[in-house]
């Protein structure tokens, strides 16, 4: 389009420059007005100095200065093959170059040397499109040699994102200690710490004599406190190579205290290494299991919610229908305990355990509990699951408690609670298990806090007028235990240190049989049943979030369907390494 001026117009012929280049290329091919031959060994191609000098700072310096090449009829280009040089000359005269797996590396090197930045970036873009776990480490090194930041960034991103696959490649074993340390220590690394440890040991053993001295520094990059205790026990704690290093022994001993002690490490032992959070590649997901759906029979549905995308996803269904089972998460797995099995005309109280792996999207059978129970409560502490109270096979109210040791895969009886209650709120804080309220066999609210000292296996109880919750969950939010509703709108935050309650902002409705969990230091409440203003009971699909910073509630929309008596859990995982990918 012409540009209008006060005294006329400026005519712009947008095809003129490309036509001119095409004519110049025709002159080159016909060897008309060419004044220099660019050579690679015996191969040569006639060119125009003016065209080459206009195309790149490299040739401009060569032909417009007092270098001898400015006067020579033939110029040898050392280090560039004839095939690559021909591609460069073709680009100069046409603006086009064919990039393939076979020619991209020599072409990129030539573009860097001869200062053709657009060809260089085109080669970089092509290599980025070809990135895979099998070649990304090699391309990181190539990018460093060629000073190509965009390729290096993308190749390193692939190496970190697909680290387990990268760790299996031969290229990882060829890294120097500093390069490996940078990968293992990177917070963006997507891989379970077990895989990080295995990669480290494979690298050391590849050249044991030369690499043994780097073992301590590299072991410090592994976040041992997040390794599965069974893996630590079987494959790390007594590893002969690690035990041969006193420095590594000290690291393992600190890790052992962190992983296996009921108490956790002392403040003296709890150094910066053990305060590190999980890698940033881990995300929190909200999980809903079972319950009563749309006022129908007990469902086998398992739903997963991503706070990042706001999307719900269906996962593998529970193996059987279970009424009022309990569920917990431990070591990146979900455990569903007990409940009443619901099948054609038959209802049996179960001691069964089902374990779900999000990574595999599969259920498997676990070690059964000692006692069959439903309407019970469960919680976790370190490597243990506690299953508390409930209703037994004879429909009696149970005061018993049992504990599952996930390292030894055994259940064992523990001290029973002082007062048997149904539907209390349960949480663990500072090595104590708290039971708030609940109801007795006559469905009267029990105004008690029952406290279990985990390491001493003893209980005590405290009476309080603040407690009257029934069918309410409790969660640990910061330093407080928050009791969420229970035939009430009330939200109570309990401080175990001061033994005091603080009232938080009320929920919109009087709720019971709902779920609650914590993600990102916020409380999420799901479904349940609500008491209407005219005292009717309605099932709910509400999905709400409480922010303790502002003491406010916000709606997160609706659940996929109405749901109550369900489990509501937080599960941490690396999205692309699971069934979500």
Curated annotation (Swiss-Prot):
**Mind giving the lineage of the organism this protein is from?**
Eukaryota, Metazoa, Chordata, Craniata, Vertebrata
Q: Where are the Kelch repeats?
A: 285-332, 334-383, 384-431, 433-479, 480-521, 523-573
Annotated BTB domain residues: 34-101
* Residues annotated as domain BACK: 136-237
Any idea what this protein is called? Kelch-like protein 38
Asked if the keyword Repeat belongs to this entry, the reply reads yes
Q: Which UniProt keywords apply?
A: Kelch repeat, Repeat
SS bond partners: none
* SMART domains in the record: BACK, BTB, Kelch
PROSITE patterns per UniProt: BTB
- Which Pfam families does UniProt cross-reference here? BACK (PF07707), Beta-prop_ATRN-LZTR1 (PF24981), BTB (PF00651)
- Give the CDD domains listed for this entry: BACK_KLHL38 (cd18476)
């Amino acid at each position: 389009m012409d540009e209008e001026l006060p005294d006329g117009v400026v005519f712009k012929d947008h095809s003129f420059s490309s036509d001119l280049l095409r004519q110049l290329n025709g002159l080159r091919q016909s060897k008309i007005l060419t004044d220099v031959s660019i050579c690679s060994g015996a191969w040569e191609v006639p060119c125009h100095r003016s065209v080459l000098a206009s195309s790149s700072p490299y040739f401009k310096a060569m032909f417009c200065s007092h270098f001898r090449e400015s006067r020579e009829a033939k110029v040898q280009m050392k280090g560039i093959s004839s095939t690559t040089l021909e591609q460069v000359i073709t680009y100069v005269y046409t603006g086009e170059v064919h990039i393939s797996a076979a020619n991209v590396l020599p072409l990129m090197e030539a573009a860097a040397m001869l200062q053709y930045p657009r060809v260089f970036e085109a080669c970089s873009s092509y290599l980025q499109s070809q990135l895979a776990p099998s070649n990304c480490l090699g391309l990181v090194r190539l990018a460093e040699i060629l000073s190509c930041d965009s390729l290096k960034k993308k190749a390193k991103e692939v190496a970190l994102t697909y680290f387990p696959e990268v760790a299996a490649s031969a290229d990882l074993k060829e890294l120097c200690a500093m390069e490996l340390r940078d990968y293992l220590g990177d917070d963006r690394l997507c891989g379970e710490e077990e895989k990080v440890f295995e990669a480290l040991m494979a690298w050391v053993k590849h050249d044991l004599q030369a690499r043994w001295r780097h073992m301590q520094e590299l072991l410090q990059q592994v976040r041992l406190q997040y390794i599965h205790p069974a893996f630590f026990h079987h494959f790390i704690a007594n590893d002969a190579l690690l035990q041969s290093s006193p420095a590594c022994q000290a690291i393992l001993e600190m890790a052992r205290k962190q992983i296996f002690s009921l108490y956790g490490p002392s403040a003296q032992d709890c150094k910066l290494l053990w305060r590190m959070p999980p890698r940033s590649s881990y995300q929190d997901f909200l999980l809903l299991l079972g319950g009563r759906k749309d006022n129908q029979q007990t469902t086998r549905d398992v739903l997963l919610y991503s706070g990042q995308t706001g999307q719900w996803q269906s996962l593998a269904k529970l193996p059987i229908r279970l009424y009022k089972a309990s569920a917990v998460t431990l070591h990146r797995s979900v455990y569903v305990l007990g409940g009443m099995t619901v099948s054609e005309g038959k209802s049996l109280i179960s001691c069964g355990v089902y374990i779900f792996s999000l990574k595999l999207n599969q259920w498997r059978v676990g070690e059964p509990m000692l006692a069959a129970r439903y309407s019970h409560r469960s919680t976790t502490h370190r490597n243990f699951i506690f299953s508390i109270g409930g209703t037994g096979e004879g429909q009696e109210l149970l005061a018993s408690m049992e504990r599952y040791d996930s390292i030894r895969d055994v259940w064992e009886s523990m001290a029973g609670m002082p007062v048997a209650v149904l539907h209390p709120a349960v949480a663990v804080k500072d090595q104590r298990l708290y039971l708030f309220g609940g109801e007795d066999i006559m469905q009267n609210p029990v105004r008690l806090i029952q406290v279990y000292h985990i390491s001493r296996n003893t209980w005590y109880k405290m009476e309080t007028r603040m407690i009257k919750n029934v069918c309410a969950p409790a969660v640990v939010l910061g330093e407080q235990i928050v009791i969420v509703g229970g035939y009430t709108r009330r939200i109570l935050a309990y401080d175990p240190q001061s033994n005091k309650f603080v009232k938080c902002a009320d929920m919109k409705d009087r709720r019971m049989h709902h779920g609650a969990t914590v993600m990102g230091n916020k409380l999420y409440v799901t479904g349940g049943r609500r008491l209407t203003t005219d005292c009717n009971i309605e099932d709910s699909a509400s999905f709400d979030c409480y922010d303790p910073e502002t003491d406010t509630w916000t709606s997160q929309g609706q659940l996929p369907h109405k749901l109550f008596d369900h489990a509501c859990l937080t599960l941490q995982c690396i999205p692309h390494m699971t069934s979500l990918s």
